[in-house]
Amino acid sequence: MPPKTRGAVRKPRRKDKKNIALGQAHIKSTFNNTIVSITDPNGAVSITDPNGAVISWASAGEVGFKGSRKSTPFAAQMAAEAAAKRAQEHGLRKVDVFVKGPGSGRETAIRSLQAAGLEVGSIQDVTPSAHNGCRPPKRRRV
C-alpha cells in the first residue's frame, strides 16, 4: 500500500514590498492590551478589499508579553516599535496617528513611533463614547 500524503504542498506566498510613503497608525489601547496597526492612507481594512490595507501590525501579546504585563506602557512601546520597523520595510516615512481606548499605553506608543524614525503628522483621539446608549456593566466588588 502506498504511503498516505496530506494533499498538495503549498509554496510559501512571497510578500510583495509596497512602496507607501504616507500612512495611518491606528493605536487601540485597552486596559488589557495595546494593538498598533499601520495602514495605507485610505485607512484600515475595507469590506470591498478582502486583503485589506494593513501594512503592518503588532500587539503587546504578539511581541511576547503575557498576562498583566501586556497592559503596561513598556509593552505598548515595544509593540509600536515592532509595527513601525515592519512598516519602514515597505517605505513608510510619515504617519497620521489615530488613538482609540482608555489604556495606559497611548502616549508611549506615539512616542515610540517617533523614536523608531516615523514622522508623526497629526494625532487624533477617536475613542468611541456612548451618548447614553447601552447600560454599563455592574460595579466591581473586590
UniProtKB/Swiss-Prot annotation:
GO cellular component, one term: ribosome
Name recorded for this polypeptide: Small ribosomal subunit protein uS11
Pfam annotation, one family: Ribosomal_S11
Lineage: Bacteria, Bacillati, Actinomycetota, Actinomycetes, Micrococcales
Family stated for the protein in its record: Belongs to the universal ribosomal protein uS11 family.
One Gene Ontology biological process: translation
Function text: Located on the platform of the 30S subunit, it bridges several disparate RNA helices of the 16S rRNA. Forms part of the Shine-Dalgarno cleft in the 70S ribosome.
Segments of this protein annotated with the region Disordered: 1-21
Entry-linked HAMAP family: Ribosomal_uS11 (MF_01310)
InterPro entries reported for this sequence: Ribosomal_uS11 (IPR001971), Ribosomal_uS11_bac-type (IPR019981), Ribosomal_uS11_CS (IPR018102), Ribosomal_uS11_sf (IPR036967)
Subunit structure: Part of the 30S ribosomal subunit. Interacts with proteins S7 and S18. Binds to IF-3.
